[in-house]
From Swiss-Prot:
<dbReference type="GO" id="GO:0003723">
    <property type="term" value="F:RNA binding"/>
</dbReference>
<dbReference type="InterPro" id="IPR024794">
    <property type="entry name" value="Rbsml_eL15_core_dom_sf"/>
</dbReference>
<dbReference type="GO" id="GO:0003735">
    <property type="term" value="F:structural constituent of ribosome"/>
</dbReference>
<dbReference type="Pfam" id="PF00827">
    <property type="entry name" value="Ribosomal_L15e"/>
</dbReference>
<keyword id="KW-0689">Ribosomal protein</keyword>
<dbReference type="GO" id="GO:0002181">
    <property type="term" value="P:cytoplasmic translation"/>
</dbReference>
<dbReference type="GO" id="GO:0022625">
    <property type="term" value="C:cytosolic large ribosomal subunit"/>
</dbReference>
<protein>
    <recommendedName>
        <fullName>Large ribosomal subunit protein eL15z</fullName>
    </recommendedName>
</protein>
<dbReference type="InterPro" id="IPR012678">
    <property type="entry name" value="Ribosomal_uL23/eL15/eS24_sf"/>
</dbReference>
<comment type="similarity">
    <text>Belongs to the eukaryotic ribosomal protein eL15 family.</text>
</comment>
<dbReference type="InterPro" id="IPR020925">
    <property type="entry name" value="Ribosomal_eL15_CS"/>
</dbReference>
<dbReference type="InterPro" id="IPR000439">
    <property type="entry name" value="Ribosomal_eL15"/>
</dbReference>
<keyword id="KW-0687">Ribonucleoprotein</keyword>
Length: 204
């Protein structure tokens, strides 16, 4: 087995003594640092490479901290108008994953870079930590590489804000295939619109 295979097996057994100790020490360190911080190299090189990372110019990795828990409805003093059914405030669940939120925060802060992918690295009772792989679309090494220069096209600006990354496609329900998923495409909203639009076709 190569080195990456050993690293992969280590990460598969997160409850082992080695990983528990490592993760506790790292988590303590992450808590002391800012919410978005650049890292020199990926914490999980095997995972990062599977998701498209290359150790060359133009690729950047940032660690993002996201607070865990549900989403509270942002209303002043808990005043929600309407029926009692819709007056919930605290026990609501955000429709997007925390990973997609981490990608969004990194993408907003680093507007000149393109978000390629992301992966989980750590968590404690309060936070989850993700590493985000970003690509500098203006770098000549990226623009010349046929495997990655697709991301230089203008259509890929802020793909993380439009649900086009892997995490984004997951929360949009686009991972599955077959007849069971026909209501998820092209999007939930488009399907709703198609089903709720009265179409009176001319008889020919």
């Amino acid at each position: 087995m190569g080195a990456y295979k050993y690293i992969e097996e280590l990460w598969k057994k997160k409850q082992s003594d080695v990983m528990r100790f490592l993760q506790r020490v790292r988590c303590w360190e992450f808590r002391q640092l800012p919410g978005i911080v650049r890292v020199t190299r990926p914490s999980r090189p095997d995972k990062a490479r599977r998701l498209g990372y290359k150790a060359k110019q133009g690729y950047v990795v940032y660690r993002v901290r996201v607070r865990r828990g549900g989403r509270k409805r942002p209303v002043p003093k808990g005043i929600v108008y309407g029926k009692p059914k819709n007056q919930g405030i605290t026990q609501l669940k955000f429709q997007r994953s925390l990973r997609s939120v981490a990608e969004e925060r990194a993408g907003r802060k680093l507007g000149g870079l393109r978000v390629l992918n992301s992966y989980w690295i750590n968590q404690d009772s309060t936070y989850k930590y993700y590493e985000i792989i970003l690509v500098d679309q203006a770098h000549s090494a990226i623009r010349k590489d046929p495997r990655i220069n697709w991301i230089c096209n203008a259509v890929h600006k802020h793909r993380e804000l439009r649900g086009l990354t892997s995490a984004g496609k997951k929360y949009r329900g686009l991972r599955g295939r077959g007849h069971l998923y026909h209501k998820a495409r092209p999007s939930k909203r488009a399907t709703w619109k198609r089903n709720n639009t009265l179409s009176l076709r001319r008889y020919r």
